[in-house]
A protein has these predicted regions:
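Ribokinase/PfkB-type carbohydrate-kinase core domain
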Residues: 6-146
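Conserved phosphate-binding/catalytic region of the ribokinase-like
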Residues: 55, 61-65, 85, 110-210
């Protein structure tokens, strides 16, 4: 569960309790539930618990043995500070698609410069999607850098879930074999929907928006 305070400008402060998420263990990960899908999506939050971390590593091994894509989100700035070295090893060895906001990616490569963070993303030789709030997002794939414009909304009501819905829209595009620019546009559409109202669940079927 999560207690969220939302300001008038839509920014929010969260106090998160992971609850049952901390009880996930390797025994809960069944190959047949994973290999029937195209992409696995892992949350950095789960690195806060050793059992959950081992469960995610088991999922990574299953995906790699089945040649599945693995997506990973850095989740939170403080999460990066706690697990930077573990994340570094995971990113460099196992991940195909990385999601982060601007502050998280800068923290991961320990720089205050966004340009240097983009250079770091280029060096990873994978797809890296970096969200930048009202400045849209940047998708990096090796030396290719694609700037994605934000989808405008009448009013930003609540930014809770914006990063999650961005990832959902992006991965929807990847699963549909769309080019990275289109994936980024889908991501922006999904994020725009979620920030236009209170709560982190969409009020419409997202596939109807793209």
């Amino acid at each position: 569960c999560c207690t969220i305070f939302v300001e008038d400008d839509g920014t929010r402060t969260m106090c998160t309790f992971l609850g049952a998420g901390t009880l996930i263990s390797p025994e809960d990960i069944h190959p047949e539930h994973i290999t029937s899908h195209k992409i696995a999506y892992l949350e950095g939050y789960l690195w806060d618990n050793q059992n959950a971390k081992m469960a995610m590593k088991k999922m990574v091994d299953i995906c790699k043995s089945d040649n599945q894509q693995i997506a990973f989100t850095l989740s939170d700035l403080f999460c990066v500070d706690r697990h930077r070295e573990s994340f570094k090893e995971l990113i460099e060895n196992d991940i195909d698609i990385l999601f982060a906001n601007e502050d998280e990616i800068k923290a991961q490569c320990q720089t205050d410069s966004f340009d240097k963070a983009v250079d770091y993303a280029k060096s990873l030789n994978m797809i890296v999607a970096i969200t930048r709030s009202e400045n849209g997002s940047v998708v990096v794939n090796k030396n290719e850098v694609i700037e994605i414009n934000p989808v405008q909304v009448d009013r930003v009501v609540d930014t809770t879930g914006a990063g999650d819905l961005y990832a959902a829209g992006f991965l929807f595009g990847v699963a549909k074999n769309k080019d990275l620019s289109t994936c980024g546009h889908y991501a922006s559409i999904a994020a725009a929907e979620i920030i236009s109202h209170y709560g982190a669940r969409p009020l419409v079927k997202l596939s109807n928006l793209v």
